[in-house]
């Protein structure tokens, strides 16, 4: 194992839940304002998850005031306090970019049954 792989293994976070595209999640992000630090919740649907060790990231989309907002989070970021999986969605694609063009009821995702 070379030095780069060893450094990436040290930076990995093992406390993240298992989720994938289509899942509705809440991301608790640490926001620093001046000398204060607070937690802000970004809730939405995962539309993309890229794999990798230290460079893994995921994109969450939500509708805020009738406008779609997407935010990209590094999975191993220290600014993420925790991730909650609200519902598990059933989709047939790993990247669900088609949600960007859908509105209203058409943008709903069926819930995956956990057996």
UniProtKB/Swiss-Prot annotation:
Keywords: Ribonucleoprotein, Ribosomal protein
Record carries keyword Ribosomal protein: yes
Record has Ribonucleoprotein as a keyword: yes
InterPro entries: Ribosomal_bL19 (IPR001857), Ribosomal_bL19_CS (IPR018257), Ribosomal_bL19_sf (IPR038657), Translation_prot_SH3-like_sf (IPR008991)
Assigned GO CC terms: cytosolic large ribosomal subunit
GO biological-process terms attached to the record: translation
Superkingdom of the source species: Bacteria
Signal peptide per UniProt: none
Alphabetical list of Pfam families matching this protein: Ribosomal_L19 (PF01245)
One annotated GO molecular function: structural constituent of ribosome
Task of the protein: This protein is located at the 30S-50S ribosomal subunit interface and may play a role in the structure and function of the aminoacyl-tRNA binding site.
HAMAP family, per the entry: Ribosomal_bL19
Family: Belongs to the bacterial ribosomal protein bL19 family.
Protein's name in the database: Large ribosomal subunit protein bL19
Naturally occurring in which organism (per UniProt): Desulforapulum autotrophicum (strain ATCC 43914 / DSM 3382 / VKM B-1955 / HRM2) (Desulfobacterium autotrophicum)
């Amino acid at each position: 194992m070379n030095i780069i792989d060893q450094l990436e293994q040290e930076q990995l976070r093992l406390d993240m839940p298992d989720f994938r595209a289509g899942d509705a999640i809440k991301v608790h992000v640490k926001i620093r304002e001046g000398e204060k630090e607070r937690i802000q919740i970004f809730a939405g649907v995962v539309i993309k998850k890229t794999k990798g060790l230290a460079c893994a990231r995921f994109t969450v989309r939500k509708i805020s005031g009738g406008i779609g907002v997407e935010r990209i989070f590094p999975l191993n970021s220290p600014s993420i306090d925790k991730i909650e999986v609200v519902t598990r969605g059933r989709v047939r694609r790993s990247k669900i970019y088609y949600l960007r063009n859908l509105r209203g009821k058409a943008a709903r995702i069926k819930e995956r049954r956990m057996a």
